[in-house]
Amino acid sequence: MRSILLLSSGLDSVAALAIALDNSDVFMALTFDYGQRSVKKEIEYSRMVCEHYGIEHRIITLSWLSSITNTSLVNKDLDVPELSINDLIDGPDNITEDSAKSVWVPNRNGVFINIAASFAESHGCEYVIAGFNGEEAKTFPDNSKEFVNAVDECFSYSTANGVKVLAPLIDMDKVSIVRKAMELGAPLEYSWSCYHGAEEPCGVCESCMRRKRAFLASGFEDPHIKKRADFKR
């Protein structure tokens, strides 16, 4: 089974890669540059992940996507929402819904997965692997099982070899993802979750908070934070 992987270097995509390699041949990983704040970090860390596993890495530039996007992920005049762990656990639904709206990029996952399907078909790969997961599906519908099923139906018409989406995290929350990734020895020290692209993760954006909560609840120390702390000693 050969596949193309969507790789942002975030917790989910790195974990999905580790799981996929346990069961299949990942032919290539694709990282997308659509002008997001964290793009340099995503490319840097994705490259390290691919070097770790010996996988070909391609960067796909989508400058047109940033030009039609008014989101805090791209527009630096807009503030990226800051959340607390309590907001994620006990906060009202509108807090995470408002955060999701602030970082929403029009049809981003739809664009990414269709490009990946083109690579998959051209290289004789049967699957596109994505880090879609059950936790984020609650606020991002393009992470859901329904989205995956709809895309599979579309690909049955738009690809000659019937490419399918493989989402190994689709029923998992972030705590389960961390535990599985650590079990498989995924190089999470090379994963970048922050919406920002500063030298250090901000620690307060929704993505950082979900990662922080997941590691706390899992009982594991975050290898990325530990690696940076060790480097400073």
UniProtKB/Swiss-Prot annotation:
Alphabetized UniProt keyword annotations: ATP-binding, Ligase, Metal-binding, Nucleotide-binding, Zinc
Pfam families given in the database record: QueC
Family annotation (InterPro entries): QueC (IPR018317), Rossmann-like_a/b/a_fold (IPR014729)
Free-text remark on how the cofactor is bound: Binds 1 zinc ion per subunit.
Reactions this protein catalyses: 7-carboxy-7-deazaguanine + NH4(+) + ATP = 7-cyano-7-deazaguanine + ADP + phosphate + H2O + H(+)
Binding sites annotated in the UniProt record for ATP: 7-17
EC number: 6.3.4.20
Molecular-function annotations in GO: ATP binding; ligase activity, forming carbon-nitrogen bonds; zinc ion binding
Pathway entry: Purine metabolism; 7-cyano-7-deazaguanine biosynthesis
SUPFAM superfamilies in alphabetical order: Adenine nucleotide alpha hydrolases-like
Residues noted as binding Zn(2+) in the record, renumbered to the chain: 194, 202, 205, 208
Cofactor entry: Zn(2+)
Job description of the protein: Catalyzes the ATP-dependent conversion of 7-carboxy-7-deazaguanine (CDG) to 7-cyano-7-deazaguanine (preQ(0)).
Similarity remark: Belongs to the QueC family.
NCBIfam families with a match to the protein in the record: 7-cyano-7-deazaguanine synthase QueC (TIGR00364)
Name of the protein in its database record: 7-cyano-7-deazaguanine synthase
Organism listed in the record: Methanococcoides burtonii (strain DSM 6242 / NBRC 107633 / OCM 468 / ACE-M)
